[in-house]
Design a protein with these regions (language model features):
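C-lobe/activation-segment region of protein kinase-like
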Residues: 262-268, 281-287, 291, 295-340
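Conserved structural core of kinase catalytic domains
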Residues: 188-202, 209-213, 219-266
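Alpha-helical interaction elements in eukaryotic regulators
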Residues: 203-204, 221, 240, 268, ...
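Phosphate/pyrophosphate-binding loops and the adjoining catalytic core of nucleotide-dependent enzymes
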Residues: 1-189, 198-199, 207-209, 223
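AlphaC helix (C-helix) of the protein kinase catalytic domain N-lobe
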Residues: 204-214, 276, 331
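Eukaryote-biased feature marking scaffold/signaling PDZ-domain proteins and nuclear chromatin regulators
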Residues: 185, 203, 220, 234-236, ...
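Conserved hydrophobic alpha-helix
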Residues: 272-279
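Conserved hydrophobic "DFG−1" position in protein kinase catalytic cores
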Residues: 181, 243, 295-296
Length: 340
């Protein structure tokens, strides 16, 4: 059964156990605040809430079921907190899937703000306010002046970007991925930019401007930047990248020992190595080099993605992050992943 809501950004803090859920139902955005202090009147509710929060920690490893599948702890937390919201969700008119929707509709949907309290061992929704969705405080970064040549990339309003909606959809997409530009038949991947992503976005823009120069004479297996989405206030809402149809899976999701992939690990390693070699020759560092950041398309070709920088423990040492040395260390770990 298709879920009635679509999960958007989940917010938490290292300072406390408060959280915020953002979900889309029909064409509405529900912003739901959960404060630890407001659950203290019910020890049972508070205990379960803290258990759910602890399961969102990066180092938490869920248990596999009898079929070897791992539960999605974020989905489970949403299921639990949103249970008392279901009558509210079901009271909304269904999504009109015949309508043409844009990024504007998704990113600036009408917002309904709630908090949750505990009463007699039950979670209870408390309505706070409704807004017209003209602002989205979660999405969009104001970039400072830089030496980036923006002239090579077209800018688009979110109103210009079409978001395809499945005819069976029950809600707008909380974080649209596949979008369409005016006059372009092929889809683009919309990489959303959140309010705190200033440094990451500047780094990606610099990298994609260099990749654009490489692509002219030496095609490489990375996405290209086809445009930038900017709202009426001048905030960068997202990047429009080449859409790599990978069936939704990264290299890290592939069991390379499966006979159906016989011979492919060597092909993929050669493609990854060659792409990295070309990038380094042009002064471009991949950054967060790991199997998660390699997509395998439907033609079984490997593409490097995510040029926002950083590192992932177990793939690149912190002291080698954002360096050629770090890229080569990540490449070695990818090789070990491909040839266990």
């Amino acid at each position: 059964m298709r879920p009635i809501y679509d999960i958007g950004p989940f917010r938490s803090s290292v300072k406390n156990k408060d959280t915020q859920l953002n979900v889309y139902v029909s064409d509405k955005h529900f912003k739901i605040d959960v404060f630890e202090d407001e659950l203290r009147s019910s020890p049972a509710i508070l205990k379960e809430y803290l258990r759910q929060v602890s399961r969102q920690e990066p180092d938490f490893i869920p248990e596999a079921d009898e079929d070897g599948f791992y539960e999605d702890t974020l989905d489970e937390m949403h299921d639990w907190i949103l249970r008392p919201f279901m009558p509210i969700f079901r009271s909304l008119p269904p999504l009109d899937t015949s309508q043409r929707y844009t990024l504007q509709d998704c990113l600036f949907a009408e917002e309904l703000h709630y908090r949750v309290k505990a009463e007699e061992n039950e979670l209870v929704p408390v309505f706070l306010e409704e807004s017209d969705g003209k602002e989205n405080h979660l999405v969009g970064a104001q970039l400072p002046p830089s030496n980036i040549d923006y002239s090579m990339f077209p800018f688009y309003s979110p109103r210009d970007i079409h978001v395809a909606i499945d005819e069976k959809a029950t809600s707008l997409t909380a974080v649209p991925r596949q979008v369409f530009l005016p006059g372009r038949a092929e889809p683009c991947f919309f990489k959303i930019v959140y309010a705190g992503d200033v440094g990451i976005t500047l780094r990606e823009l610099r990298t994609y401007s260099k990749i654009r120069a490489i692509e002219a004479g030496n095609p490489i297996r990375t996405p290209q930047l086809h445009g930038i989405v900017q709202d009426d206030r001048g905030s960068i809402m997202g990047l429009l990248l080449s859409y790599i149809d990978s069936g939704g899976s990264a290299l890290s999701c592939i069991d390379v020992s499966d006979p159906q992939y016989s011979g492919l690990p060597q092909k993929w390693f050669d493609q990854i190595s060659r792409t990295l070699e070309v990038l380094h020759a042009h002064g471009i560092v991949w950054g967060d080099a790991k199997a998660d950041n390699v997509l395998i398309d439907l033609n079984e070709n490997a593409y490097l993605i995510d040029f926002g920088g950083g590192y992932t423990e177990g793939w690149v040492d912190k002291g080698k992050s954002d360096s050629i040395e770090g890229d080569l260390q990540g490449l070695q770990h990818i090789k070990e992943f491909l040839f266990p």
